[in-house]
Each structure stands twice: as structure tokens, then as C-alpha cells.
Amino acid sequence: MSKLTIVAKITAKKDSVENVKKELLKLIGPTRKEYGCIEYNLHQDNEDPAVFVFHETWENLVCLENHMKSDHFKNYVNAVDSLIEGKIVHKMTRIA
């Protein structure tokens, strides 16, 4: 099974940027310790601070699915549900 790359774009509401950032940062430590997590990096757009992007690499889809079932991920979803304008998640496989 191929490794899985995730690019997830989260857009915070303008009045919630710092709260969303705080919740996103809480994910880093526990997620990087998860089985199958190869890379889990958070970025913030230089021109629009309300835009955050995760670049993730997972051993496989099962590892990603387990991450999404974790308590820390569920806590994040509950905490930011009303604070974000939207999210776009791309699940990709490296081809070169």
C-alpha cells in the first residue's frame, strides 16, 4: 500500500484566527506520536493569516483513519466547528 499525502486547508473566521491556531497547534505533539504518522506540519499563510495548511504524510489510509478517530482530533473538530469558514482536504498519492 502506498504512502498517503494529505494537504488540508482550514480557513478560520476573521475573528477566530488565534483560537483556531491554538487548537491546531494542540494537534501537533500527539499526532506526530501516532503510529503511521511520517510527517505532520502546520503552515499559516503569509498574506492571509486566517488560512492554515497542514501537509501530512501517512503510512497508509488506515493510519489516517485512526488519526481521525483519535480523541485529540475529535476534540479539535468540536473546538473549531463554529470558528472556521471552511476546510478543503486533498488525499493524494505521490507519483514521482
PLM features: residue spans?
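A broad "ordered helical/assembly scaffold" signature
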Residues: 16, 40-41
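An amphipathic, aromatic/His-enriched active-site/gating alpha helix that lines ligand/cofactor pockets
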Residues: 26, 32-38, 57-90
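Extended aliphatic helical segments
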Residues: 7, 17-20, 51-53, 62, ...
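Hydrophobic alpha-helical segments with strong N-terminal bias
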Residues: 20-23, 28, 44, 54, ...
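N-terminal first-folded block
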Residues: 4-32
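Short, well-ordered beta-strand segments in beta-rich or mixed alpha/beta enzyme
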Residues: 4-10, 41-68
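Glycine-rich beta-strand-turn "strand-cap" elements at beta-sheet edges
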Residues: 2, 41-48, 77-96
